[in-house]
């Protein structure tokens, strides 16, 4: 199928057929090119490839057919010109940010972030002379107030991890782009391009932890950066090649490409299950509050309808009784897996205050609006009645 015809096709068709590459034996499934290096026909050809005068592969850290295939697939789904793959979500995020900033530059970021992103921005970049200002991106005026003459990047997660706050991507992009040289980078892991496409709303760069929904089966660690072709070349040739070395393996690229073929149908079922679970949680007496974009009670329900095609499958909720109640709930579940990460076929649950965000001070958690009783739930693909029965058993133990 020609690329121009594929671009006019539906999402599932692009997810299945996008990035197809020719192979010598006519294999329907993309072969795995499990090699560290590639052979040149002549010394002259090797010279041309290193000089960038001829397309082709040199060394898998610099590129591999499996990585190229899945990069093209994701770029097509996100509506970007190109994509770069990485060995983890943080590998993608750090590679993407390193090529945007230098010592003396400034970043504005959401104050509620994935724990490792928070650490990279606040504890990592500061060692190299990059300043970071954290703001509540639910209020675009806070972003505008934080931008300085040396600001180079606005970094967003929406929905935010772990409390599900949304950011109006278009509003923030409109503000950022009034200032010369300021780019907007959005972590689209929670939504995937099936639910939200930040580039269409004005973002310059999209990052993903492909460990989550893109792969969808809990057996890969990987990440992506999507954006303009010139920028992605810099991410690959400077960010990944020289600064982080965080290249994706061919086998992981193969698994992600295979997983993405079912992305649409998986996301639809994830979201159906999550809607039903959220409605159950909202009625349980041990639950103080539920934060889910698909509930009319969600404070940003209208924004969710505006920029998300579906509400997603991540739920945050607060249990009555604080930290001890949160831990007790974790220890009284049998089907839901007590584990970090998200986007797997299995339902995963965790208590940030005692788990993922335990290395941070109570003040840092409070600044990110992570309460002691907050629970994060990644709703899986099990029968929803079984998920609810397990949650009911655990929550009933708190009464």
From Swiss-Prot:
GO cellular component, one term: cytoplasm
Top-rank taxon: Bacteria
Annotated binding of substrate, by residue: 114, 376
An MF annotation (GO) of this entry: methionine gamma-lyase activity
EC code(s) of this entry: 4.4.1.11, 4.4.1.2
Catalytic activity: L-methionine + H2O = methanethiol + 2-oxobutanoate + NH4(+); L-homocysteine + H2O = 2-oxobutanoate + hydrogen sulfide + NH4(+) + H(+)
Family, per entry: Belongs to the trans-sulfuration enzymes family. L-methionine gamma-lyase subfamily.
Name of this protein: L-methionine gamma-lyase
Species whose genome carries this gene: Porphyromonas gingivalis (strain ATCC BAA-308 / W83)
Lineage of the organism: Bacteria, Pseudomonadati, Bacteroidota, Bacteroidia, Bacteroidales
Gene: mgl
């Amino acid at each position: 199928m020609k690329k121009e015809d594929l671009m006019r096709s539906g999402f599932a068709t692009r997810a299945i057929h996008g990035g197809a590459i020719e192979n010598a034996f006519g294999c329907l499934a993309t072969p795995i090119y499990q090699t560290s290096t590639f052979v040149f026909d002549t010394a002259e050809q090797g010279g041309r490839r290193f000089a960038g005068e001829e397309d082709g592969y040199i060394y898998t850290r610099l590129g591999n057919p499996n990585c190229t295939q899945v990069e093209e697939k994701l770029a097509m789904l996100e509506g970007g010109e190109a994509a770069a793959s990485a060995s983890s979500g943080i590998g993608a995020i750090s590679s993407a940010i390193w090529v945007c900033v230098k010592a003396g530059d400034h970043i504005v970021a959401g104050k509620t972030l994935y724990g490792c992103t928070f650490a990279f921005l606040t504890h990592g970049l500061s060692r190299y002379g990059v300043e970071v200002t954290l703001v509540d991106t639910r209020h675009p005026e806070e972003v505008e107030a934080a931008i300085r003459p040396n600001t180079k990047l606005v970094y967003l997660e929406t929905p935010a991890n772990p409390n599900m706050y949304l950011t109006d991507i278009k509003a923030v992009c409109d503000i950022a782009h009034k200032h010369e040289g300021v780019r907007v980078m959005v972590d689209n892991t929670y939504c995937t391009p099936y639910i939200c496409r930040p580039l269409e709303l004005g973002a310059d760069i999209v990052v993903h932890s492909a460990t989550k929904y893109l792969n969808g089966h809990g057996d890969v660690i990987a990440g992506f950066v999507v954006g303009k072709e010139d920028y992605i070349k810099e991410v690959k040739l400077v960010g990944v090649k020289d600064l982080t070395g965080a290249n994706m393996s061919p086998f992981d690229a193969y698994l992600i490409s295979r997983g993405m073929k079912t992305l649409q149908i998986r996301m639809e079922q994830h979201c159906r299950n999550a809607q039903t679970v959220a409605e159950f949680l909202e009625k349980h007496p041990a639950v103080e509050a539920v934060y889910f974009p698909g509930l009319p009670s969600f404070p940003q329900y209208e924004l969710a309808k505006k920029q998300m095609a579906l509400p997603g499958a991540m739920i945050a909720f607060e249990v009555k009784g604080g930290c001890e109640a949160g831990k007790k709930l974790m220890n009284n579940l049998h089907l839901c897996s007590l584990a970090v990460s998200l986007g797997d076929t299995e339902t995963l649950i965790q208590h940030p205050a005692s788990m993922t965000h335990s290395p941070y001070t109570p003040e840092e958690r409070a600044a990110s609006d992570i309460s002691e009783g907050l629970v994060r739930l990644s709703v899986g693909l099990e029968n929803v009645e079984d998920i609810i029965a397990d949650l009911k058993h655990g929550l009933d133990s708190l009464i």
